[in-house]
From Swiss-Prot:
Protein name: UPF0246 protein VC_2355
Domain of life: Bacteria
HAMAP family per record: UPF0246
Signal peptide segment: none
Organism: Vibrio cholerae serotype O1 (strain ATCC 39315 / El Tor Inaba N16961)
GO biological process, one term: response to hydroperoxide
Lineage: Bacteria, Pseudomonadati, Pseudomonadota, Gammaproteobacteria, Vibrionales
Length: 257
């Protein structure tokens, strides 16, 4: 079972991490190409392209300038600890055991606009480049055209290496659009998380993102191997709803918080 999640805009390069083990990201030649494009952008260009404040634009212009093709624990940190958005609040990577991290290294992948695909212990230099960014490049008008089938091929390698053909899609639509399902050698299963609000169950972004991280942790901690076993997920009050689920979409609901 291979899990894919989105990255996060919020990063943490300060908090202590639980391991000094790391691996090198595998698609850095492609990342370096994107960095060269990004280095041609002014702070105002970045602000307009990414719809961010002048301050955040300036920060990322500096990050692009400082980015190096050599990744060390001095200029980078393991991706699973560097990302700190809602998904990662749910994942709580800092409390995973060494054995959990070993399992995650084989079974969890983070999609990324700059790095393509990251394993949990892959070193990552700080950046901001969301997959939906319309960054013109030598391969096309945006990052989907830049990455083409590279991300899909990398996921296929991971699927083959870990021994079955189930991919659990816990990524956002923006990121999973970078994957070509027709070329993916896997059955795709997408968990859907709905929270009660004013008497109706709906997908509430903040809760759904956190739930995706909690589901990833559930799979890692329990060494889940089958789609059937995903139905047992009950973290934070969620429960499986068989009547609304299909073989490709598993629906989980929770009462109003």
């Amino acid at each position: 079972m291979l899990i894919v999640v989105s990255p996060a805009k919020t990063l943490d390069y300060e908090s202590p991490v639980s391991t000094s083990n790391f691996t090198q990201p595998e698609l850095t030649a492609h990342s370096a190409e994107l960095i060269q494009v990004c280095r041609t952008l002014s702070s105002q260009d970045v602000s307009e392209l990414m719809s961010v404040s002048d301050k955040i634009a300036g920060l990322n212009v500096a990050r692009f300038a400082q980015w190096s093709e050599t990744f060390t624990l001095d200029n980078a940190r393991q991706a699973i600890f560097a990302f700190k958005g809602d998904v990662y609040t749910g994942l709580e990577a800092e409390t995973l055991s060494p054995q959990d991290l070993d399992f995650a290294q084989q079974h969890l992948r983070m999609l990324s606009g700059l790095y393509g695909v990251l394993r949990p212990l892959d070193l990552m230099q700080p950046y901001r480049l969301e997959m939906g960014t319309k960054l013109a490049n030598a391969r096309g008008a945006n990052l989907y055209q830049f990455w083409g089938d590279i991300i899909t091929e990398k996921l296929n390698q991971a699927i083959e290496a870990q021994g079955d053909n189930v991919l659990v899609n816990l990524a956002s639509n923006e990121y999973f659009k970078a994957v070509n399902p027709k070329r993916l050698n896997a059955q795709i299963v997408t968990p859907i998380f709905k929270d009660a609000k004013n008497g109706q169950y709906k997908i509430i972004s903040f809760f759904a993102k956190k739930a995706r991280g909690m589901m990833a942790r559930y799979i890692i901690e329990n060494r889940i191997k089958s789609v059937k076993d995903l139905e047992g997920f009950n973290t934070a009050g969620y429960y499986f709803v068989a009547s609304e689920s299909t073989p490709t979409e598993l629906v989980f609901k929770r009462e109003e918080q």
